[in-house]
Amino acid sequence: MSNPSEANFWRSIKTGLSSTDTCYTRLENSSALGTPDLLLLDRNKSFHLIELKVAKGNKVLLSPHQVAFCVRHRGSNSWVLVKKNDDVLLYRADQAMDLFEQGVKLEPH
């Protein structure tokens, strides 16, 4: 996460998760480019990797490394969570390329 609005998005997610029975870790890894921002263990003990993004207009600014990570991990519990105004949209990893190209005009699955 590189910009203040994404940091604010993370803080709001962290606040919301604090009242759940999930376990989460924010990943800050500059050595493995494209690694998602959040590792989440849900109440069913399944892990999820989640990239957090804030839309700029309709655009979702995913780096080529982030898209590549999603493409490599499609079919897994890897996601892109996008905030646009008051809406929060959850996209599967296999939608990353289309999300990069179409932005939030793309329908989440």
Predicted regions and their residues:
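Helix-rich interaction surfaces within compact, conserved domain-sized segments
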Residues: A96-H109
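Conserved catalytic cores of phosphodiester-cleaving nucleases, focusing on short active-site segments
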Residues: L38-L40, S46-K56
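Nucleic-acid nuclease catalytic cores
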Residues: H73-D98
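Acidic-basic catalytic patches of nuclease active cores, encompassing PD-(D/E)XK
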Residues: M1-N29, R43
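Short, flexible beta-strand-to-coil junctions
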Residues: R43-N44, A55, V82-D87
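Beta-rich catalytic cores
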Residues: G34
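Mg2+/Mn2+-dependent nuclease catalytic core
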Residues: K56-H73
